[in-house]
């Protein structure tokens, strides 16, 4: 009989991880492979067999929801917290207190920059207009306001891009001086304009924080790490476990490294580089794929059995994402069979598609506004739910859907467009300036995001598209994996 955790028997791959005593262990866990059960099994083994006091175990997850869920499943007095809660606890233990801004404060400042702060600053308005290839500056403010009003959706996407740039700048421990170095490395007009705009936003953001007496979450992580380096108190942890490690940023790594250096704790991190989709929050996939570069005496183990998807789907999705050589190679397996799990649906009649699918359905979209074109008097949308006839369907962005699953999944608007899938604005090469990762494959994160969309289903995934505007991802699936694809016309 295998090792039993919460009434479930672990498979051989999961058992091997639970019993491993490496100093630094990376667990590569595929989608739907039971990684949470493995984490619980590991903690149970450390407490019951290795006799480690639960107070000396630190478990980190990325959301309050996931930490609360893990606490309930463990039923032990273990520190289970987010990185932000960890940083706060370190600072409070050392009698250091700050006022912390809301998590969306940077987004707010960036939005205000484009829609208010910029007014009255003609040179900055000219700079922004030039970035969008507009060079007529008679009555600059009037021209700028008209441009923003007419191109609201595009401006909204560029707001996200500038937020992402500044977020990566801070999470990768760059500073104001870095802008000088960046300018030496780029020569194209548009990229230099982007840097100039980003610099203005960065200065405004930092001044806003200072004038309001605030620090942001990234500053707080750095303060916690500096407190430890300067001899501050830190609980004597013997074992650290981090879930969703593929979403860790460089400064979070620096914080963990400072704790390990002070306590000599062992560490196990769990995640899936195929599902590294939060670069806009500062995550650095290099920490995952080059784990041995950052942690000494390291070892890699994999969980390659998946319990959610069919073999046909997981094989197709896996080969698709591994086109990028930067990803860790895996041979994902499943005992489930489904001959044609990927349905490419030509047309935009969501109503008809909802009528023909049996079972529960989750609806996904790449962009928040994708749902609008599918709504009518019979299909309504509110608070992440679509109502059709007497049924209600959950509807999320692909980012929001990570970790979720459903019998069947519909992905909207998988077309070749600036705001399609892949989203061509988000995948801007200038982000490489503020990234420590060497992952330079075109649309690498969009490719991983598409993988996440494909693997939410337990049965079939339906890609709603336009046969005259096929996404490059759909074209690739048809070319390379036609055996597992069915094309529907509605």
Name what the model sees in each region:
Residues 26-27, 33-39, 297-299, 305-390, ...:
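Helicase P-loop NTPase motor core
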Residues 79-82, 216, 224, 391-399:
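Conserved two-lobed SF2 helicase motor
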Residues 107-208:
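Coupling/switch/interface segments within P-loop NTPase motor domains and analogous charged loops
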Residues 56, 61-153, 397:
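Conserved P-loop NTPase-based nucleic-acid remodeling module centered on helicase motor cores
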Residues 2-19, 23-28, 187-286, 305, ...:
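Conserved helicase NTPase motor core
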Residues 250-340, 484:
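Conserved RecA-like helicase ATPase core segment
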Residues 401-467, 475-476, 484:
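Conserved helicase C-terminal RecA-like lobe
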Residues 1-100, 455:
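P-loop NTPase Walker
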């Amino acid at each position: 009989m295998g090792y039993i955790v919460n009434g479930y028997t672990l498979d051989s791959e999961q058992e091997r991880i639970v019993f491993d005593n490496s100093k630094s262990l990376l667990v590569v866990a595929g989608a739907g492979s039971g990684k949470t059960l493995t984490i619980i099994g590991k903690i149970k083994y450390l407490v019951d067999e290795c006799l480690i006091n639960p107070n000396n175990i630190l478990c980190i997850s990325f959301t309050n929801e996931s930490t609360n869920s893990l606490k309930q499943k463990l039923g032990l007095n273990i520190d289970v917290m987010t990185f932000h809660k960890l940083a706060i606890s370190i600072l409070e233990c050392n009698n250091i207190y700050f006022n912390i801004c809301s998590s969306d404060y940077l987004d707010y400042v960036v939005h205000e920059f484009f829609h208010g702060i910029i007014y009255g600053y003609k040179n900055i308005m000219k700079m922004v207009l030039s970035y969008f290839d507009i060079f007529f500056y008679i009555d600059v403010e009037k021209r700028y306001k008209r441009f923003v009003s007419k191109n609201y959706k595009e401006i909204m996407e560029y707001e996200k891009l500038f937020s992402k740039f500044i977020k990566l700048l801070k999470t990768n421990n760059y500073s104001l001086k870095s802008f000088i170095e960046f300018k030496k490395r780029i020569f194209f007009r548009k990229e230099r304009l982007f840097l100039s705009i980003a610099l203005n936003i960065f200065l405004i953001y930092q001044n806003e924080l200072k004038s309001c007496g605030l620090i942001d979450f990234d500053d707080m992580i750095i303060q916690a790490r500096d407190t430890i380096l300067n001899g501050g108190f830190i609980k004597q942890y013997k074992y650290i476990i981090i879930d969703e490690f593929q979403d860790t940023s460089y400064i979070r790594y620096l914080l963990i490294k400072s704790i390990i250096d002070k306590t000599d704790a062992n560490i196990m991190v769990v995640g899936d580089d195929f599902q590294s989709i939060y670069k806009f929050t500062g995550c650095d996939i290099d920490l995952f794929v080059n784990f041995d570069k950052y942690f000494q005496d390291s070892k890699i183990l994999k969980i390659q059995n998946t319990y959610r998807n069919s073999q046909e789907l997981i094989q197709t999705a896996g080969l698709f994402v591994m086109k990028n050589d930067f990803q860790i190679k895996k041979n994902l397996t499943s005992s489930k069979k489904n001959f044609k799990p990927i349905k490419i649906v030509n047309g935009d009649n969501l109503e008809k598609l909802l009528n023909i699918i049996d079972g529960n359905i989750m609806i996904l979209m790449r962009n928040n506004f994708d749902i609008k074109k599918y709504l009518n008097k019979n299909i309504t949308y509110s608070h992440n739910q679509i109502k059709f006839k007497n049924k209600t369907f959950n509807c999320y962005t692909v980012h929001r859907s990570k970790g979720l699953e459903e019998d069947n999944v519909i992905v909207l608007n998988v077309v070749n467009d600036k705001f399609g899938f892949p989203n061509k604005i988000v995948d801007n090469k200038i982000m490489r300036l503020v990234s420590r990762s060497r992952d330079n494959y075109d649309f690498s994160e969009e490719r991983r995001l598409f993988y996440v969309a494909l693997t939410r289903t337990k049965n079939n995934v339906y890609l709603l598209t336009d046969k005259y505007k096929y996404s490059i991802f759909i074209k690739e699936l048809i070319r390379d994996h036609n055996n597992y694809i069915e094309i529907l016309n509605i």
